């Protein structure tokens, strides 16, 4: 692996760890030339999935876009970063298992909502308020009442 500091083409692996139930490998490396250390992450490349938006536009699936939405919903909530990574990994595994080149954005939104609901009620309501585009406080109240009515 090329050193990000001096661009030397070779480095030694000094530590390897599995993360996220073995779905990601973290490697600590040391450059053979300059001796500086750096970290690399290795994960299986997803099959190309196209997301079909509500307006019919198509765009490539973007894990970072998913993570930004989930992080925003969980802002200042007691949700560990590992839980968010696991949520994204679960969604990606489910998308890959479907073995379909195109998926509607609504399917991904539903997957996120189902998982957020199990993680944190406030994050779920925050995400739902944007995802479902609540037009008024009444719709938001219905979502909260539904959540409370189901024993959360």
Swiss-Prot record:
Domain ATP-cone: 49-139
Entry protein name: Transcriptional repressor NrdR
Domain of life of the organism encoding this protein: Bacteria
Keywords per UniProt: ATP-binding, DNA-binding, Metal-binding, Nucleotide-binding, Repressor, Transcription, Transcription regulation, Zinc, Zinc-finger
Molecular function (Gene Ontology), one example: zinc ion binding
Gene Ontology BP terms: negative regulation of DNA-templated transcription
Function: Negatively regulates transcription of bacterial ribonucleotide reductase nrd genes and operons by binding to NrdR-boxes.
HAMAP family listed in its UniProt record: NrdR (MF_00440)
Zinc is among the record's keywords: yes
Zinc fingers typed unnamed, residue spans: 3-34
């Amino acid at each position: 692996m090329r050193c990000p500091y001096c661009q030397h083409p070779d480095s030694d692996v000094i530590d390897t760890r599995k993360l996220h139930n073995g779905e990601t490998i973290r490697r600590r490396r040391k450059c053979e030339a300059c001796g500086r250390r750096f970290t690399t992450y290795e994960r299986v490349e997803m099959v190309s999935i196209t997301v079909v938006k509500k307006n019919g536009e198509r765009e490539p699936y973007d894990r970072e876009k998913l993570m930004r939405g989930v992080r925003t919903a969980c802002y200042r909530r007691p949700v560990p970063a590992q839980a968010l990574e696991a949520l994204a990994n679960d969604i990606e595994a489910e998308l890959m298992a479907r073995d379909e080149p195109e998926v509607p954005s609504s399917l991904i939104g539903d997957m996120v909502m189902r998982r957020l609901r199990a993680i944190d009620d406030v994050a779920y309501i925050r995400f739902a308020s944007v995802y479902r585009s609540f037009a008024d406080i009444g719709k938001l109240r219905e979502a909260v009442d539904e959540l409370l009515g189901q024993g959360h």
